[in-house]
């Protein structure tokens, strides 16, 4: 695992821990061989069908994660339905890492709860990317901001492997999706820095 990959993992974990009054990180996992996350170029992506919200969140994520760029502007025609094509497009733009954030409904029977190996369901970028976007497109209304959690996953694109995953605790108070994601990313980044996955 390269040093850049290790740094990126650390940065994202730290993002999930910074907010003093924000959500807490309830579960996280890292690949055993991952010591520090360091990517040359990492893509940030927020899974939502709301294009304006996606741009706003991806822009803010890119300011928090060193060496990262928002997917919507770096690869405007990035495939959301064909994971193999998406990975090919990203590699073509010299991306070697992907940080993907999505809001999940903890009441959804398809969402595995923390502590039950939820992160093992998608060990590679291709499977996660496809599942995440298919699930989002199936929503009939925007995600609520109460009773949901934020999930952050980091993949290396070179060998198409999951290197870090984390989820926040379910929200109990209503807040905007942007605020929820902002605070969650802060929590992840703090976690990543505290565990020395990033500097």
Predicted regions and their residues:
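Sec-dependent bacterial lipoprotein signal peptides
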Residues: 1-18
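Residues at beta-strand starts and edge strands
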Residues: 5-8, 40, 97, 146-148
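Alpha-helix termination/capping residues and helix-transition junctions
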Residues: 12-15, 36, 92
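C-terminal/domain-edge helix-coil "capping" segments
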Residues: 18-39, 49, 130-199
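N-terminal segment of the mature soluble domain
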Residues: 38-113
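Surface-exposed short loop/turn segments
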Residues: 83-154
């Amino acid at each position: 695992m390269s040093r850049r990959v290790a740094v990126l993992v650390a940065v994202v974990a730290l993002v999930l821990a910074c907010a003093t009054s924000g959500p807490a990180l309830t579960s996280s996992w890292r690949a055993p061989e991952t010591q520090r996350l360091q990517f040359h170029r990492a893509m940030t992506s927020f899974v939502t069908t709301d294009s304006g919200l996606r741009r706003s969140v991806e822009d803010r994520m890119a300011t928090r994660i060193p060496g990262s760029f928002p997917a919507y502007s770096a690869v405007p025609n990035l495939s959301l339905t064909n994971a193999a094509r998406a990975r090919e497009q990203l590699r073509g733009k010299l991306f070697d890492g992907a940080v993907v954030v999505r809001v999940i409904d903890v009441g959804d029977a398809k969402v595995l709860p923390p502590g039950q190996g939820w992160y093992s369901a998608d060990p590679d970028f291709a499977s996660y990317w496809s599942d995440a976007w298919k699930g989002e497109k199936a929503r009939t209304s925007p995600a609520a901001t109460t009773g949901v959690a934020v999930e952050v996953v980091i993949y290396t694109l070179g060998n198409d492997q999951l290197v870090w995953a984390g989820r926040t605790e379910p929200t109990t108070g209503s807040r905007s999706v942007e605020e929820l994601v902002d605070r969650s990313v802060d929590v992840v980044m703090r976690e990543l820095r505290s565990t020395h996955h990033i500097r």
